[in-house]
Amino acid sequence: MSDDRPDVPYLNVEDILDSPDRTGAVISPDGSKFAYLAPWRDRLNVWIQDLDGEEKARCVTADSRRSVLRYHWTDDPRWLLYEQDGDGDENYHLHRVDLGNPDVDAVDLTPFPGARVTGFDLPPTRPGHAVLNLNHRDPAVFDLYELHIATGELTLLARNPGGSSALVYAPDGTMYGHGLSEDGDIELSRWETESGTMRSVTTFPGSDHPLGLQPFQLTPDGTGAWVGSYRDSEHTRIVHVDLNTGQETVVDSHPGLDIDPRAAVFPTLPSPLILDRRTKDLIGVRYLGERAVIRPLTAHFADVLDNLRELSDGDVAALSSDREGQRWIVSFTHDRDPGVTHFYDHTTGDSRVLFRPYPHLDPAALAPMAPVTIRARDGLELPSYLTLPLQRKPAGLPMVLQVHGGPWHRDSWGFDPTAQLLANRGYAVLQVNYRGSTGYGKSFLKAGIGELSGAMHDDLVDAVGWAVKQGYADPARVAVFGGSYGGYAALVGVSFTPGLFAAAVDFCGPPNLVTTLRNMPDFAKPYLTNNWHLYAGDPEDPAQEADLWARSPLSRVADIRTPLLVVQGANDARVLKSESDQIVEALRNRGIDVEYLVKEDEGHSFVNPENNIAMYHAADHFLARHLRGGGTAAAGSSI
């Protein structure tokens, strides 16, 4: 297929998949500066710039091996903290940067091989300190520590007795945790210091929460917690749990939407709870439907939010303010003008654009993402998104079914680099929130139980049928593309319905559910009860092991005849490289067309820009070859 759209500029893979010029801005507590992420030696690092002065921005971290994605201002203007893992192994360490002495190297404050920091917090009642969970004693168990930021001294606060996913620290020194009871429910408990045991406060149905209690946040006085709960509701709502009595009180809810669930999977995304910078009071809650909805809980934040919404026709995304709640930095989600970041002064009403992450991308050259609803064969409505190429008749197009991971996640409106690249090549892109996706209510979530390779796959098949029936897609030129669970879905697509797809791209997808679940990292194993074991099965049960194998693409490898591109990070802690090796070897032994791209310095998702660029060059070339699209193969380029 030749590209006959002279007014649509051809976008290089690098235009969309390279690191942004700037992103991830957060204002300093005193409101005088802001930090952001920008490239240094081809890696995202933390930079700091004055908001009012003319002082030149300076880079304050120096990681030339792997991009920094998570950082934190502290209450001391001297220190900045950031988190970093080792080439994608998900063992995140906490590092300290001395902002007053740029010549001093960053210090690893948790220098324990194989250890992982989680549950990081900066309690306002303990200035100069951080509280964190660390599993260096036992990879499967996270103990609670207090960190003195200036000296690096770690003090054990509570030794986790097991069964608690993480411990949190209240202002009065009381500690709480949430873990699984014997029957799989989630138990919120208080740490009893004298006995070193946990005492139950209340429980939540485990099957309602495959990823645990999300969100979970102690109130500033430590006597309660704000929790996302389905109890007595079809949609998640914020409840206040009294940590003495266990009594629940509804704080906020939306009549038709769930709380935004995305930060539970991607912690770099904004939390659904918006807190006051100084008091830590709850001032707003994020919900998510076709578009994002923020409900303000205070008059001051409602006024601020009204003014912020005037800055863009996108959705309010990341937010930060100074301690007084007067100076704000806000970024916006937008399908064609992504991440535009503004400074807003509530005292004066002044605002200005700080930066666009991708200033070289013209919004007019990018394709809009449209919400659509698809009815599955059993009548279930599947909220979905359709991106169509610009200046091309939306009929008989090659199409890519782009499947989100998780499966306890969801697609949402906004800038999607994969969808934009594919639309630029002339493909229609369909993203389906199949049953089991989060954010669409309890019934929709639980409709995925036991349905891997079953009704969850049928939803994707029905979505392809919908696109063909609507006239958008050429049934002979449909590909499937996904990562993690989406990669599994791609493999299921070519093994369980081998005639449906003309090509498939699997990024870190598990071809063998039995071995994948047995090889889960130690830190994940205690919490499989309400996600993988409930939705798919427990490989330690012989009957369930047999069912898991029957739902595994590797069990039907003899049926695969579709061209396949497999992409894998060598350090993936969740889907080991040996998993992808299995299916690649089996297919090559049968003479099936399979391309295999492995990156030695990546894990379950790719972070470094050259690796993302290499993957998408490979996918661009591969899809152009098999769908006769407008990618690099059609353009005569090579990879």
Give the positions of each predicted feature.
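Active-site-proximal cap/loop segments of hydrolase catalytic domains
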Residues: 434-639
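Acidic helix/loop microenvironments that form the catalytic cleft of cell-wall polysaccharide enzymes
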Residues: 405-407, 485-486
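Hydrophobic/aromatic beta-strand patches that form the interior of the parallel beta-sheet core
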Residues: 131, 283, 372, 401, ...
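Short beta-strand element of the alpha/beta-hydrolase
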Residues: 395-405
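Peripheral, non-catalytic segments that deliver or gate enzyme domains
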Residues: 2-8, 12-24, 29-33, 37-70, ...
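Short hydrophobic segments within beta-strands
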Residues: 228, 387, 402-403, 481, ...
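A fold-wide structural signal in alpha/beta-hydrolase
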Residues: 399, 423-433, 595
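A structural micro-motif
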Residues: 55, 104, 196, 427, ...
